[in-house]
Each structure stands twice: as structure tokens, then as C-alpha cells.
């Protein structure tokens, strides 16, 4: 019998999550049936969306999330022992699957790249950047792009794709170390929003002519400031609002209506699961190619040990990670 450890939601979050919100449980998994596989987690992801998605869980449910896993026992010919897969299996060390929810690595995945990238730059965050920028914003060469949380898993890819497409990129991050990383990635302007005197003046200095596209990972007052400096017919892709996820009071006011109206701005929220099938596979191949060629750089913030899943999650929500937050099981 295999014993699986799982992190569950003990109590719903109020404000920032704390260790008391989580409980580690151990269960014995049943023997495999025909068509099933037994999976062992290798890497697990913690992402901002989990803070909001957890509202739909019942107390006692396992926390949700993707992981990279290895098949360690198989009664399914499509997934022999040793196969590496990516799947939404939750915060658990071991799982049983019938194979329907499992995604194999891209056939061209090189041995030189870490498997954990399938949870970051060549996974859900990278796809979010890809489709949010190219489809939602409809990015064109020569435009000016603003992205916040720019040193994170999504924002760092947004900026680098925009540079690949011939755009000017301005990025905001929350530490000098992160700003240095953005400059290494080729951002034209990068600033630490925690140490500047005026966000409005910093944005204006970075791009006096304004912004064509804004990729919003943060929401709140920051986004209102950017909205006021968008160009005519500017496009805003609303990916996240991490600045508001842990609020206990009322949400901040939205952008000035007159700015939205008279500049004819387009706001669109989106969830990356919209894109499936071949269009998704093409995006993954593009991302893998760019990473393999060194055109997109990446940084991972890896926490060792499955027992540290809650700590990694809480640290990510407070911006302690540089790049993609990953847990190595």
C-alpha cells in the first residue's frame, strides 16, 4: 500500500493565509484497477489564483494545483512506468489517475531543461503571458507595454515576449533585486514601486507618450494610475489582482470612467484555460523554442520539501519569490 500525504484547507482564509489554515493528512491509496496509474509528485506549483479558487473548496478539501509527476506503477498501456506527466492533481505526494487528466511532456523537451519549467515558463504561467499579450492585447510591433509584478512567473514572460515582438517594455517589481533581474531580461525600463516617490510621475517619465498595452497582474490603485496614462484605444489584459486577494475590507475604486470613455479603452479579463487543443500546443512549442534558444530567460524560486507547501504559498503571496515559485517534493 502507498501512503499519500496531502495538504488540505482546514479553515477558509481571512486576509493573508496562515499555517493554521492548512492541515497535513495521510491516506492509504487502494490497489490500481485496470486502466489506472499511480503517480508520484516531483514538483508542485503555488500560484496566486489559488488564494481565490480556495473559496470554492469546502473545509477539509485538498488544496488544488498542478504538479509534475512520474508514473511509478501502471495498468494503463498509454502511460508506462517512468512516464513524466503534468496534471492538476492537487497538493499531494501520490495520486491515482485513469489517464484522462494527464498531459505528457512535449516530445521535443530537451534533457538540458528542468522539468519544473512545465509549471512555469513553459506551462500555465507562460501560456497566460502568451495568450494575454498576443490574443487579448493584440500586441503589435513598435508598441509600448506596461506590466506589473514583472519579475513573477507571468510578468517576466510578458516582458520578454513583448521584446521579441519589437516593443518597448516598462516593468514594475517589488525589490531592487527584482528590478536588476528585469534589466537582465531586456526590459527597457524597470522600477521598484515600493521605493519611488510618485507612481504617476515614474510612469510618465518611463513613457511620456503613454502606453498601448497594459498587462495587469496586480489590480487596485496601481492599475488606476496606469489606466490614466493609456493611449487612445489602449488595451488592458486583466490577468490577476494580487493586491486585492488578501483584503478584508471593501475593494478599491475602479479606474476613472472619463478616462476609459474618452480614450476608448478596452479592458478584458481572461483565464488561460480558454485556449485548448492545437493552439495551446503551438504556444507551448513556441515557448519551449524561445527558452531553448535563450530568447526567454527564466528564474525559479524552489522550496525543498512537500511539508513546506503552505510556507511556499504564503511567501509567494507576499512577493518573497523571484520568478516562479515551485516546491520540490
UniProtKB/Swiss-Prot annotation:
The modification N6-acetyllysine is found at residue 178. Its EC number is 1.3.1.48, 1.3.1.74. NADP(+) binds at residues 152-155, 178, 193, 217, 239-245, 270-272, 321. It is an enzyme of class 1 (oxidoreductase). The keyword DNA-binding does not apply. Optimum pH is 7.5. It is found in: Cytoplasm. Keywords: Acetylation, Cytoplasm, Fatty acid metabolism, Hydroxylation, Lipid metabolism, NAD, NADP, Oxidoreductase, Phosphoprotein, Prostaglandin metabolism. GO terms for cellular component: cytoplasm; cytosol. GO terms for molecular function: 13-lipoxin reductase activity; 15-oxoprostaglandin 13-oxidase [NAD(P)+] activity; 2-alkenal reductase (NADPH) activity; leukotriene B4 12-hydroxy dehydrogenase activity. Its main location: cytoplasm. Down-regulated by nonsteroidal anti-inflammatory drugs diclofenac, indomethacin and niflumic acid. Monomer or homodimer. NAD(P)H-dependent oxidoreductase involved in metabolic inactivation of pro- and anti-inflammatory eicosanoids: prostaglandins (PG), leukotrienes (LT) and lipoxins (LX). Preferentially uses NADPH over NADH as cofactor. Catalyzes with high efficiency the reduction of the 13,14 double bond of 15-oxoPGs, including 15-oxo-PGE1, 15-oxo-PGE2, 15-oxo-PGF1-alpha and 15-oxo-PGF2-alpha. Catalyzes with lower efficiency the oxidation of the hydroxyl group at C12 of LTB4 and its derivatives, converting them into biologically less active 12-oxo-LTB4 metabolites. This is Prostaglandin reductase 1. It comes from Sus scrofa.
Amino acid at each position: 500500500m502507498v501512503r499519500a500525504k496531502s495538504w488540505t484547507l482546514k479553515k477558509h482564509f481571512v486576509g493573508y493565509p496562515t499555517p493554521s489554515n492548512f492541515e497535513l493528512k495521510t491516506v492509504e491509496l487502494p490497489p490500481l484497477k485496470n486502466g489506472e496509474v499511480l503517480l508520484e509528485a516531483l514538483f508542485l506549483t503555488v500560484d496566486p489564483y489559488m488564494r481565490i479558487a480556495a473559496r470554492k473548496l469546502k473545509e477539509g478539501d485538498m488544496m488544488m494545483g498542478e504538479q509534475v509527476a512520474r508514473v511509478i506503477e501502471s495498468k494503463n498501456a498509454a502511460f508506462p512506468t517512468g512516464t513524466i506527466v503534468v496534471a492538476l492533481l492537487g497538493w499531494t505526494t501520490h495520486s491515482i489517475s485513469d489517464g484522462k487528466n494527464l498531459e505528457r511532456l512535449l516530445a521535443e523537451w530537451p534533457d538540458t531543461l528542468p522539468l519544473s519549467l512545465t509549471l512555469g515558463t513553459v506551462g500555465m504561467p507562460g501560456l497566460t503571458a502568451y495568450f494575454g499579450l498576443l490574443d487579448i492585447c493584440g500586441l503589435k510591433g513598435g508598441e509600448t507595454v506596461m506590466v506589473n509584478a514583472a519579475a513573477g512567473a507571468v510578468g517576466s514572460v510578458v516582458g520578454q515576449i513583448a521584446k521579441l515582438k519589437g516593443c518597448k517594455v516598462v516593468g514594475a517589481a517589488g525589490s531592487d533585486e527584482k528590478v536588476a533581474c528585469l534589466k537582465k531580461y531586456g526590459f527597457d525600463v524597470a522600477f521598484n514601486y515600493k521605493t519611488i516617490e510618485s507612481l504617476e510621475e515614474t510612469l510618465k517619465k518611463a513613457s511620456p507618450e503613454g502606453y498601448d498595452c497594459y498587462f495587469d497582474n496586480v489590480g487596485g490603485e496601481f492599475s488606476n494610475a496606469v489606466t490614466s496614462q493609456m493611449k487612445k484605444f489602449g488595451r488592458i489584459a486583466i490577468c490577476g489582482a494580487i493586491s486585492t486577494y488578501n483584503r478584508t475590507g471593501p475593494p478599491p475604486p475602479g479606474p476613472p470612467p472619463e478616462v476609459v470613455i474618452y480614450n476608448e479603452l478596452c479592458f478584458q479579463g481572461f483565464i488561460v484555460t480558454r485556449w485548448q487543443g492545437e493552439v495551446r500546443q503551438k504556444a507551448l512549442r513556441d515557448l519551449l523554442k524561445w527558452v531553448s534558444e535563450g530568447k526567454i530567460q527564466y528564474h525559479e524560486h524552489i522550496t525543498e520539501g512537500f511539508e513546506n507547501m503552505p510556507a511556499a504559498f504564503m511567501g509567494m503571496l507576499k512577493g518573497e519569490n523571484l520568478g516562479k515559485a515551485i516546491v520540490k517534493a
